[in-house]
Amino acid sequence: MAYPVQLGFQDAASPIMEELLYFHDHTLMIMFLISSLVLYIISLMLTTELIHTSTMDAQEVETVWTILPAVILILIALPSLRILYMMDEISTPSLTLKTMGHQWYWSYEYTDYENLCFDSYMAPPSDLKPGELRLLEVDNRVVLPTELPIRMLISSEDVLHSWTIPSLGVKTDAIPGRLNQATLMASRPGVYYGQCSEICGANHSFMPIVLELVPLKHFEEWLLSML
């Protein structure tokens, strides 16, 4: 989860999020090198008299500043496309979870099981237990197994919403009349928090998401208690 005055991303808890962090660092380093070069050239122009007022043509320079940006864009595009394909690829899922957005709560349905569905509202501050987070805790957590591919089917009953878990690298819009799909696979157990990330009305800020990722054995025990 995020902490006050935190500048970086949340700790990655899925292979996709790890790839996104690597891509962020890769792109940031390229931006840093370009910015350093531009600042160096600006400082050089301000502190020296290396100007060529009589130069009318410089094909070598024009060739360099055409090819170099193209190479840089390719270096950014290739890993970006790789991650996009990874996020879109869904192998045979072990579990399917259907998520519906409402004003202003989420409803979940485990489509592989009969009658396993529930609504998830933000827990009011008066009901919070010690250690639970204000505005982020819910009355019904989503429990899922770790280290297994899970297919998320996401839609909305009313307006646009967005189902987002930053530490898992998942952000999918919930659009009325459309069923969007996402992949989720957690690499370690834990409790992961998210929120609706699309302004959806007066109580948009009060649509938290809580995932409880547990080992498969504990997930099976939870299933038996719910069915």
From Swiss-Prot:
Domain of life of the source: Eukaryota
Gene Ontology biological process terms in this record: ATP synthesis coupled electron transport
Positions annotated to bind Cu cation A1: H161, C196, C200, M207
PROSITE patterns, A to Z: COX2, COX2_CUA, COX2_TM
Mitochondrial intermembrane topological intervals: 1-14, 88-227
GO MF, any single term: cytochrome-c oxidase activity
Reaction catalyzed: 4 Fe(II)-[cytochrome c] + O2 + 8 H(+)(in) = 4 Fe(III)-[cytochrome c] + 2 H2O + 4 H(+)(out)
GO cellular component, one term: mitochondrial inner membrane
Cofactor: Cu cation
Compartment(s) where it occurs, according to its Swiss-Prot or TrEMBL record: Mitochondrion inner membrane
Membrane topology value: Multi-pass membrane protein
Cofactor: binding comment: Binds a dinuclear copper A center per subunit.
TM helices/strands, residue ranges: 15-45, 60-87
Keyword Protease on entry: no
Enzyme class, first EC level, given as a word: translocase
Residues annotated as binding Cu cation A2: C196, E198, C200, H204
EC number: 7.1.1.9
Summary of subunit composition and partner proteins: Component of the cytochrome c oxidase (complex IV, CIV), a multisubunit enzyme composed of 14 subunits. The complex is composed of a catalytic core of 3 subunits MT-CO1, MT-CO2 and MT-CO3, encoded in the mitochondrial DNA, and 11 supernumerary subunits COX4I, COX5A, COX5B, COX6A, COX6B, COX6C, COX7A, COX7B, COX7C, COX8 and NDUFA4, which are encoded in the nuclear genome.
Family that this chain belongs to: Belongs to the cytochrome c oxidase subunit 2 family.
PANTHER family: CYTOCHROME C OXIDASE SUBUNIT 2 (PTHR22888:SF9), CYTOCHROME C OXIDASE, SUBUNIT II (PTHR22888)
Function text: Component of the cytochrome c oxidase, the last enzyme in the mitochondrial electron transport chain which drives oxidative phosphorylation. The respiratory chain contains 3 multisubunit complexes succinate dehydrogenase (complex II, CII), ubiquinol-cytochrome c oxidoreductase (cytochrome b-c1 complex, complex III, CIII) and cytochrome c oxidase (complex IV, CIV), that cooperate to transfer electrons derived from NADH and succinate to molecular oxygen, creating an electrochemical gradient over the inner membrane that drives transmembrane transport and the ATP synthase.
Entry protein name: Cytochrome c oxidase subunit 2
Organism of this sequence: Eulemur macaco
